[in-house]
Amino acid sequence: MEDKKANIIATILILALVVVIIAARVSLKLSKTFYLIAGVDISLILAVICFLIIRSRYNKERKLLVSRFASEGRELRIEYSFLRKVAGVPTKFKLEDLEEATDGFRSLIGKGGSGSVFKGVLKDGSQVAVKRIEGEEKGEREFRSEVAAIASVQHKNLVRLYGYSSSTSANRPRFLVYDYIVNSSLDIWIFPDRGNRGRSGGGCLSWEQRYQVAIDVAKALAYLHHDCRSKILHLDVKPENILLDENFRAVVTDFGLSKLIARDESRVLTDIRGTRGYLAPEWLLEHGISEKSDVYSYGIVLLEMIGGRRSISRVEVKETKKKKLEYFPRIVNQKMRERKIMEIVDQRLIEVNEVDEEEVMKLVCVALWCIQEKSKKRPDMTMVIEMLEGRVPVNEPPDSDVVVVDLLAADDDDASTGVRRVVNIPKLQIHRERNFRLSSICSSIISPISPR
């Protein structure tokens, strides 16, 4: 705009000087005064023309310089973004940046108890998943847990925290920004009723892919338990929190319920939190939790991958036409003792005849070791990796009492009859009023604690 004004003023000035010369010629003829005025005017006209030429060249060079700086600035921002990725340093985003990246939070790709997840594209072209954590007390607790747990960890089988956005205002939600994982979560690939609900992906994961997912998740948990400065307990291991990348390799996500503990701590007491079917018995019995609680949840996930079904379901009893709880791990344990292990495998895998029976037996044995009632009997995740990769033989696990089933069945019966009862478990007697608040705990299991 300034250049345009300068050019207009210069043109008007030149025209004015030309008019002065013409007027002087008419009035003064060819006198000495005319030549003096003409000389001064011509000098001024030449000066204005020189000014325009110099200014034009200067503006052209300035535009080239600005363009080059802008290009270098973009490259610098991209390079800086790349360096932050390599270093694993989370970026603090403004809310406006996340709104722009997610198109006003319109692209919803997931929703659960800890928040909603939206797909987004950042200014540098990176595809991200933006998790919105809402609620004051719960949101703040989960936000701090998740940032503390994952900000400093880097592992190929753990989702990477790209950045975050927080506000001092209690009413504003908090955001966590993760790498976008294209094939969504494991549940829609192993449970038949999850693949047709409008979510991206969906289908039947092959046996080979399931086995690799088992190894990937084991490595992720082993890293959290043994290779970090503080032990990190995930405390919400389940198919919904296991994502699959473009090569169907597993990436563990959602650290909203995680807990950091010192390396010299063997177990800690904490409030019951998690998802039904994946909670270890020691958690329900208020004996304190440890990394072996994650091992238990992992074992349940293994069984669900093998069978293509949930660990807990309600089935109708033909005689009474009432529904009762059916616990898949108990069925697996029984079939293994009867040497009918192929009867529990996902029928879709049987139909395509791609299942190795020896691998099924190995995976079932590993899973049953992982869900032993006594946490000391469970292997740690490094041992699980050794067993899955064939470096350590897998022995047949001991028969299980399946404590969780007794707890669930007791509460299920009491809910329908209103009768108080004592649940007898080997070496353990639990009474409602004196030693254990069974009803409150089991009811929290039956209705999902974390409805995701």
Curated annotation (Swiss-Prot):
Record topological domains on the Cytoplasmic side: 55-452
Query: By its UniProt entry, which InterPro entries does this protein fall under?
Result: G-type_lectin_kinases/EP1-like (IPR051343), Kinase-like_dom_sf (IPR011009), Prot_kinase_dom (IPR000719), Protein_kinase_ATP_BS (IPR017441), Ser/Thr_kinase_AS (IPR008271)
Q: How does this protein sit in the membrane?
A: Single-pass type I membrane protein
Q: Which residues carry this modification: Phosphothreonine?
A: T270, T275
Q: Does the keyword Signal apply?
A: yes
What the entry lists under PROSITE patterns is as follows: PROTEIN_KINASE_ATP, PROTEIN_KINASE_DOM, PROTEIN_KINASE_ST
Membrane-crossing ranges are: 34-54
Extracellular-side segments: 24-33
Q: Sites of the modification Phosphotyrosine?
A: Y178
Signal peptide feature range: 1-23
Residue positions of the active site: D236 (proton acceptor)
What EC number(s) would the UniProt record show? 2.7.11.1
Q: What is its main location?
A: membrane
Is ATP-binding one of the keywords UniProt gives this record?
A: yes
Question: Which reactions are catalysed by this chain?
Answer: L-seryl-[protein] + ATP = O-phospho-L-seryl-[protein] + ADP + H(+); L-threonyl-[protein] + ATP = O-phospho-L-threonyl-[protein] + ADP + H(+)
Annotated binding of ATP, by residue:
I109, G110, K111, G112, G113, S114, G115, S116, V117, K131
GO CC annotation: what is one?
A: membrane
| Single GO MF annotation | protein serine/threonine kinase activity
Give the record's keywords alphabetically: ATP-binding, Kinase, Membrane, Nucleotide-binding, Phosphoprotein, Receptor, Serine/threonine-protein kinase, Signal, Transferase, Transmembrane, Transmembrane helix
Where does the record place the Protein kinase domain?
Answer: 103-392
Q: Where in the cell is it found?
A: Membrane
Classify the source by domain of life: Eukaryota
Similarity section: Belongs to the protein kinase superfamily. Ser/Thr protein kinase family.
Q: What is this protein called?
A: Probable receptor-like protein kinase At5g20050
